[in-house]
Amino acid sequence: MSVEKTNQSWGGRFSEPVDAFVARFTASVDFDKRLYRHDIMGSIAHATMLAKVGVLSDAERDAIIDGLQQIQAEIEAGSFDWRVDLEDVHMNIEARLTDRIGVTGKKLHTGRSRNDQVATDIRLWLRDEIDTILAEITRLQEGLLGLAEAEADTIMPGFTHLQTAQPVTFGHHLLAWFEMLGRDYERLVDCRKRVNRMPLGSAALAGTTYPIQREITCQLLGFDAVGGNSLDGVSDRDFAIEFCAAASLAMMHLSRFSEELVLWTSAQFQFIDLPDRFCTGSSIMPQKKNPDVPELVRGKSGRVFGALTGLLTLMKGQPLAYNKDNQEDKEPLFDTADTLHDSLRAFADMVPAIRPRREIMREAARRGFSTATDLADYLVRKGLPFRDCHEIVGHAVKYGVDSGKDLAEMSLDELRRFSEQIDADVFDVLTLEGSVNARDHIGGTAPNQVRAAVARGRKLLAQR
C-alpha cells in the first residue's frame, strides 16, 4: 500500500485516513463532474424545499442558492478546482459552497444522501440527453423524407439475401429507415416517462426524519412523479438500462443503414456518391475515397451493445439498496448517450447530401430477373394457380440464365414456350415501371404511395 495519505469529508468514523491510491481508485469526479449542472439544479430545489418546511431559514436558502450559482459560473468559466480527494461531483460542489458561504453550506445536505442525490442527477441529465437525441432523430427523419420525395420515381433493385429480388423505388427504400427511426423515437419517448420519476427524498435508503415535502422538489425539477419507495429510489438503474436498450436498437438500425451505404458507395455497386466532406482517403492508395462516417457508425454500435450488457451485468448481483458497484453505471451510460447522439448527428448531416446514381441503379434493377414475380402474378390473373405459375416462371428464368436474356428481353414466342397463356400484354408487366406501379397500396413501392407516405411522415413530425 502507498504511504501517501489523504483525508475525506466522511472521516469522523475512521481512525486513519484512506490510502491515497484507494482514494484515487474509488473517486468518480473525473467522469461524474459532467453532472455538475444537474447536481446544482437538484441542490437548489432541495434548499428551496428545506426553507419551505422550516429546516432552513430564508436567508440560509438565499445564501446557498447564490453560492451554488456562483459555483456553476466558476465551473463554466473553467476556473473550478476539481479535487480527487473529494471523491465526486457532489462533495466537490458542497466543499466549495462551504468555502464560499461558511457553515451554512454544510446545511445543504440535510435530509439528503449522496445515494438519492446521484440518482436524481443522473435522471435529470438523462432526461435532457433524451430530448436532444429525439431532436436529432427528427432531423434525420426530415432528411430522409426530403430525399425520399425527390427519389420517389428512382428505380433500384430490392434485395433479399443480398440477391436481386424485385424492383423498388429508392424513395421507398429510404422510407424503411424512416419507419425504423420512428420506432426508436417512440421507445425513447416511452423510456423518458420512467426516467422522469424523482428519487430525491429517499435519502440513504429508508427516507429521512425531516419533514420534507417531496412534491415541492418534484415540481421544481419538472419530474412527473415522486418515486414510491425509498429503497427502490436509490437502487433503481432500470431507467439507465432501458435507455441503453433503446439506444442499442437505434444503433443497430444505424449500423444496418451504414452497411447499405458502404455497399452502395463501393465500385461494385456505385448506387450513390457521398460528398467529400463525409469521406476520407488512404495514406498509400491515391484513388481511395472511403465512407468513414457510416463505417465508424457501424463500428460504434458495438460499444453501445457492450454498455447495455455491462449495465445488466453490473446490476444482476446487487442486493438492496445502494452499493459502490453503481459508480460504474455512469461511464457506459454517458458513452452510450454521446455515441448515439453523435451518430445521429452525423447521419442527419449526411443523408440529405446523398447523391444517387439513378441510371446505375436502374440498370442494376434490370438484371437478376427482378420482374419474375410480376410474370407469375400475370399468369395468376390468367387463371392459373400460383404454385403452377411459380414453376413456369422458374423454367423461364433458367432459360434466361442459359441464354443470357432477361425476361423482358425474350421474344413473345420464347415466353410462350413456357405457357400459352402469355400474350403480348405481358411486356407491360415486365417493365420496371410496370412492376413498381403495380404495388399501389399503403406501404407499397409505387411512386404515388411513396409520396403519400412522405406526406404522412411530415404530418407525424409536425405533431411532435
Swiss-Prot record:
Its EC number is 4.3.2.1. InterPro entries: Arg_succ_lyase_C, Argininosuccinate_lyase, Fumarase/histidase_N, Fumarate_lyase_CS, Fumarate_lyase_fam, Fumarate_lyase_N, L-Aspartase-like. The keyword Lyase applies. Keywords: Amino-acid biosynthesis, Arginine biosynthesis, Cytoplasm, Lyase. It is an enzyme of class 4 (lyase). GO terms for biological process: arginine biosynthetic process via ornithine; L-arginine biosynthetic process. It catalyses: 2-(N(omega)-L-arginino)succinate = fumarate + L-arginine. It comes from the Bacteria. GO terms for cellular component: cytosol. Pfam families: ASL_C2 (PF14698), Lyase_1 (PF00206). The keyword Lyase applies. One of its GO terms (molecular function) is argininosuccinate lyase activity. PANTHER family: ARGININOSUCCINATE LYASE. Belongs to the lyase 1 family. Argininosuccinate lyase subfamily. This is Argininosuccinate lyase. It comes from Pseudomonas aeruginosa (strain LESB58).
